[in-house]
Amino acid sequence: MLRAAWRALSSVRVQAVTQAPVPALRARSSASLPSARCGLQTPSLLNAARAYAVQKPVQAKQDDEPASSTFIKEYKNIIPNMEKVDDVVKRILSLEMASRKEKLKIKREQLMNKIAENPEDYRTLEARIVALTVKIRNYEEHMQKHRKDKVHKRHLLMSIDQRKKFLRLLRQTNYDVFEKTCKELGVEYALPPLHFQRVHRRFLAKKALCIQVFQEVQKLKKQRMALKAAAAAAKKEKRERVPENPSNALPEKTKEN
């Protein structure tokens, strides 16, 4: 929509420039803008065009985000007396100038120190869950900026499914560590349904047809029962009108005569 509005604005400008007299444009060229020369209200048109723009949701800052002033672990161990180094060198060796990979590595180490008993063991289930959580949050930040990136979206969904699998295994083996991991990472684990059946179009159409047939059969049953009740009522009325023994009715007629 912004592109269409910008094209309409440029076409109106071109029409106004072609219709305006040449001397007047030359005289005003040094003193006014192109929008003022054409007599257009540029701010109003731009505001109308900006109204069509979709505002991207702002990603909330995470609590486990490391401070930008922290030093990278490798440089901190190599260089002695890090505090006495120049400020420019400190900034270069800090997370402010670090790559994305190094930031994710430090995030994972911080979470591992909170959760795992042995932070250096990356083969345990809780360590794998921490690594997948850091990766998922990185994918979510990327998807906030690039919504149409299908490759990262697929990797995000695959990582979420894998984390669900590891959480289920950890819940079955060590429930205390599972609770601690979910609490520290801020993850909510939902139990899967007992009976899962993938819904297809054919199944939905068949189910709708069965429901429709059942409703029609119930209607026919009600109509049949109503007809039977009406026939029974008519037969009862007929029996009440006609006497059972006609011989009992003859003496009454003779008495009346």
Swiss-Prot record:
Compositional bias segments (type: Basic and acidic residues): 234-243
Any GO CC annotation of this UniProt entry: mitochondrial small ribosomal subunit
GO BP term, pick one: translation
Keyword Lyase assigned: no
Annotated localization: Mitochondrion matrix
Region (Disordered): 228-257
Keywords: Mitochondrion, Ribonucleoprotein, Ribosomal protein, Transit peptide
Pfam families: Ribosomal_S15 (PF00312)
GO molecular function: structural constituent of ribosome
Transit peptide location: 1-57
InterPro entries for this protein: Ribosomal_uS15 (IPR000589), Ribosomal_uS15_bac-type (IPR005290), uS15_NS1_RNA-bd_sf (IPR009068), uS15_ribosomal (IPR052137)
PANTHER family reported for this sequence: 28S RIBOSOMAL PROTEIN S15, MITOCHONDRIAL, SMALL RIBOSOMAL SUBUNIT PROTEIN US15M
Similarity-based family: Belongs to the universal ribosomal protein uS15 family.
Assembly: Component of the mitochondrial ribosome small subunit (28S) which comprises a 12S rRNA and about 30 distinct proteins. Interacts with METTL17.
Name listed for the protein in its UniProt record: Small ribosomal subunit protein uS15m
Organism (species): Rattus norvegicus
